[in-house]
Amino acid sequence: MKKRNKGLVEQTTTEKNNFSRKTAWKVFWWVIILAVVIGVLAYIFSPRAATAVVESWKLNGGSNSTLTAKVSGFSNELTFKQINGSTYVTDTILQVSITFDGLNSPLTVTAHKTVNSNGNVIFNIANLSINQSNGQITVNSNGTMMNGGSSNNTKSIAGFETLGTFIAPDTRARDVLNGLFGLLPIIIFVVFFLLFWRSARGISAGGREEDNIFSIGKTQAKLAKSTVKFTNIAGLQEEKHELLEIVDYLKNPLKYAQMGARSPRGVILYGPPGTGKTLLAKAVAGEAGVPFFQSTGSGFEDMLVGVGAKRVRDLFNKAKKAAPCIIFIDEIDSVGSKRGRVELSSYSVVEQTLNQLLAEMDGFTSRTGVVVMAATNRLDVLDDALLRPGRFDRHIQINLPDIKEREGILKVHAENKNLSSKISLLDVAKRTPGFSGAQLENVINEATLLAVRDNRTTININDIDEAIDRVIAGPAKKSRVISDEDRKLVAYHEAGHALVGLHVHSNDEVQKITIIPRGQAGGYTLSTPKSGDLNLKRKSDLLAMIATAMGGRAAEEEIYGNLEITTGASSDFYKATNIARAMVTQLGMSKLGQVQYVPSQGTLPSNVKLYSEQTAKDIDNEINFIIEEQYKKAKTIIKSNRKELELLVEALLIAETILKSDIDFIHKNTKLPPEILLQKQEQQAKQKLNKSEVKPESETNS
């Protein structure tokens, strides 16, 4: 029922733009921070000298004098090479300067002293070593008197102590690294926690906070702005008229309040899948120009108890803030099923969510301006409390489109397609009874794909035919290897369906027969209603459908015998049995009377029966009786019209697919149509030509 239109402009587009800008600023600041960190580290690790204070030193005189100094800022990991330098000792002041230009560079220690009568004393420093046990620096030196005095003069300065300065390698880098290594476990823990927190919130996936541990209790509904209008929807005139009142209320709520009318609380759309229920809800929001919260029934539930009820509250709280607006819950049967029909293990969880939904729709809290719309394929399974007035006031059934609506839907979807002028969309609509709007859209799309595949710019009638077959039975299996005997057997089977359908009293007429394999089927026969699309079926129509379904097996048995029947009739039996069972247990069309033994599907668990064992046997016997009677009828038709059967088979073997015009010609005239005869003559001529070109080997050798 619907045109393929996105129809929703998510308001999260603005949020995504804001998120992009925020992300850009975050990236910018992270780059700045990273640059600062790199600069600090570069400063820390750059090779340079720093100053440390010599806390104390002592020079013991003698020929092998030693200089012991305790220096702050030194660490035991330092090692030094051979040290060369000079030491000057003065009478009153002893100064020590140690220069260091790198970890592995030579170290020079200089001491100076002036002696009154003897001149200067020079000491040559041989080496410098570190005593790792006490952290003191020990300098071993050899001294020589320049004025010829004895080395005992050097002992006169023993015990002299003072302070000095020490130029040493910078140890702050080493200290910073030690501190960082100490903080490393904490940093790793913080980083992992931040990563977990960000991933749990879903920030890495475009900034959306869906399906994460921190938003378990938040609604999964998407807030959007609908652009769909009623003009985008073909058909459904009565349904759209009903929904216009909702549109008017959302546009003019004061008009209803002044009249004292209670505002519509909810609308539930129900019907077969693909009929346009979701599109209608979008159209209401688009016509009213209000926000549209779209959710699914299964989106409320989660593995944790109580999450469903919390998400319902969150959804309605957001809707109240955005009022006037529409809440649309698709497949509401997953959360609104009748209470008491589920097993105890899941009952309490589902009931909590449903109870919260009931309270929000008609409870103590006001929700003026919020209209709830829902869609389901199974209205019969919904809880009665959910369907009562005050919650879902309107129940609108969305049926499969009739022939007029199908034509309109096809026109909507063919607007931007280049269809051949020979294609009549009315004829296509006649050939697609029971198709939903989604299936009709798929027919047009498949036909377009077939044209593109053949590098054509125009869609022809053959593309439409193939597209319909694809939607009904799947793509053709033309590459499947089938023997001539199996091909002939399939032709008899499908011709049997068609022949019985032509001779029974029914509202259906045979439209097409094909023996081209599709999916699991070797072929199929298509029948459509003669006049319109009847929702009501007569008993004669149902019996005719059973007889037609049994026609394939009847033809096999008539031609090949009881021992040569095949498994090709399994789907036919399934169809016939379902029709017969419905006639007996639901429709009151049997000898058991006007009683419904099986309520509407879904109202009771499958293991619960409302009848006795004897009644169950009577039901089975009556179903078997109906099917056997129609099978006998099908066999009688096959035997009485054997010639017509053979003509249908011959036409199928020649053309593989025959349409209604050819089928009706054979049925009325009991002979092949001219088009089929022409194809037969062409095939015979081709076979003769092939035989004449293939000469026996003996003739060639002679």
Swiss-Prot record:
Cofactor (UniProt): Zn(2+)
Principal place of residence: membrane
Cytoplasmic side: 1-26, 197-702
SUPFAM superfamilies linked: FtsH protease domain-like (SSF140990), P-loop containing nucleoside triphosphate hydrolases (SSF52540)
PROSITE patterns noted in UniProt: AAA (PS00674)
Matching InterPro entries: AAA+_ATPase, AAA_lid_3, ATPase_AAA_core, ATPase_AAA_CS, FtsH, P-loop_NTPase, Peptidase_M41, Peptidase_M41-like
EC class: hydrolase
Extracellular side: 48-175
Top-level taxon in the UniProt lineage: Bacteria
GO molecular function term, any single one: ATP-dependent peptidase activity
Binding site for Zn(2+): H493, H497, D572
Gene3D superfamilies reported for this sequence: 1.10.8.60, P-loop containing nucleotide triphosphate hydrolases, Peptidase M41
Active site: E494
Protein keywords: ATP-binding, Cell membrane, Hydrolase, Membrane, Metal-binding, Metalloprotease, Nucleotide-binding, Protease, Transmembrane, Transmembrane helix, Zinc
Skewed-composition ranges (Basic and acidic residues): 690-702
Similarity remark: In the central section; belongs to the AAA ATPase family. In the C-terminal section; belongs to the peptidase M41 family.
Protein name: ATP-dependent zinc metalloprotease FtsH
Organism: Mycoplasma genitalium (strain ATCC 33530 / DSM 19775 / NCTC 10195 / G37)
